[in-house]
Amino acid sequence: MNEKSYRILKRPLVTEKSTTEKDEHNKLFFEVDRRANKIEIKEAVEQIFKVDVLDVATMNVRGKKKRVGRYFTKRADRKKAMVTIKPGQRVEFFEGV
């Protein structure tokens, strides 16, 4: 398996919305490397989870400004990917969540 694939996919995003989308529309959500494009994300998901990817949508999320005492700081910017997989296929990693 390609080591680059594991650098592209940072972590799965498990929220109430992502769980609903997974169950109803076969969509998986990941936090990905900010430099990754849709083609690289598609190849990484197909290699790691052995599924057929139909579509990839990406979103750049700006970090929120937070206050720490009297100072303001900013959380890191990140990139999210919404991956649609072929109907009938499942990813064992997300089952039971």
From Swiss-Prot:
The keyword Ribosomal protein applies. Keywords: Ribonucleoprotein, Ribosomal protein, RNA-binding, rRNA-binding. GO terms for molecular function: rRNA binding; structural constituent of ribosome. It holds the Pfam family Ribosomal_L23. One of its GO terms (biological process) is translation. GO terms for cellular component: ribonucleoprotein complex; ribosome. HAMAP family: Ribosomal_uL23_B (MF_01369_B). Belongs to the universal ribosomal protein uL23 family. One of the early assembly proteins it binds 23S rRNA. One of the proteins that surrounds the polypeptide exit tunnel on the outside of the ribosome. Forms the main docking site for trigger factor binding to the ribosome. PANTHER family: 60S RIBOSOMAL PROTEIN L23A (PTHR11620). Part of the 50S ribosomal subunit. Contacts protein L29, and trigger factor when it is bound to the ribosome. NCBIfam families: PRK05738.1-3 (NF004359), PRK05738.2-4 (NF004363), PRK05738.3-2 (NF004366). This is Large ribosomal subunit protein uL23.
